[in-house]
Amino acid sequence: MTHAAASRNLSFIDKLVGEVDKALRALSPDTKPHSRPSPKAECGELSDAEKRLSASLMRVNHTGEVCAQALYQGQALTAKLPEIRQEMNNAADEEQDHLAWCEERVKALGSHTSFLNPVWYTLSFSIGAAAGLISDKVSLGFVAATEDQVCKHLQEHLARLPQQDAASRVIVEQMLIDEAKHAQTALAAGGYNFPKPVKMGMTVMSKVMTETSFHI
């Protein structure tokens, strides 16, 4: 094996080790570095039923962020242009904030994150890596379409969260701002605008994720 080939192999192995480390951080409790503190708001008194509802919705949001984190990491691994790779890594860093915020809130409500997160992480990482292998344009388009789905879920959750649960609502509101920005950035960078049938298929997959993580 030539020195150049060995260097390429080492570089790829280094990347894989890095991705495994990121996956473990995303899926392990209390190991998520985040640059921004969780948005704070005074929470009113919640009944047991309201706590269960809020916890379930925030668990769904947490799983959504696990999927987003995996999607971005998969795309960063296979992105062809350095600037696209950096864009994916930057977005993944911001998703780390969301992950930590949601996990903290779920625990504060006396519940747990989804037991199926490893499954969703693996699936999302694979989809992201595959999209990156096709082209950066498709990869960016997938980001935009995914973030559109996330924004719809967040808007629905704002409508369902108890009004007095200001602590959860302020987190979701900030996440909504960030996710909308990710979608706009991806399209502005040249992302492919997926046709409606593709988006409908993504909606079906998204509903499976939200329904399972709401309960499990």
Swiss-Prot record:
Sorted UniProt keywords: Cell membrane, Iron, Membrane, Metal-binding, Monooxygenase, Oxidoreductase, Ubiquinone biosynthesis
Entry protein name: 3-demethoxyubiquinol 3-hydroxylase
UniProt xrefs under InterPro entries: COQ7_proteobact, Ferritin-like, Ferritin-like_SF, Ubq_synth_Coq7
Cofactor: Fe cation
Annotated family: Belongs to the COQ7 family.
Cofactor annotation comment: Binds 2 iron ions per subunit.
Location of this chain's protein in the cell: Cell membrane
UniProt gene name: coq7
EC number, as in UniProt: 1.14.99.60
Residues at which Fe cation 1 binds: E65, E95, H98, E179
Membrane topology of the entry: Peripheral membrane protein
Iron keyword on record: yes
Associated pathway: Cofactor biosynthesis; ubiquinone biosynthesis
Function comment: Catalyzes the hydroxylation of 2-nonaprenyl-3-methyl-6-methoxy-1,4-benzoquinol during ubiquinone biosynthesis.
Pfam family of the protein (one): COQ7
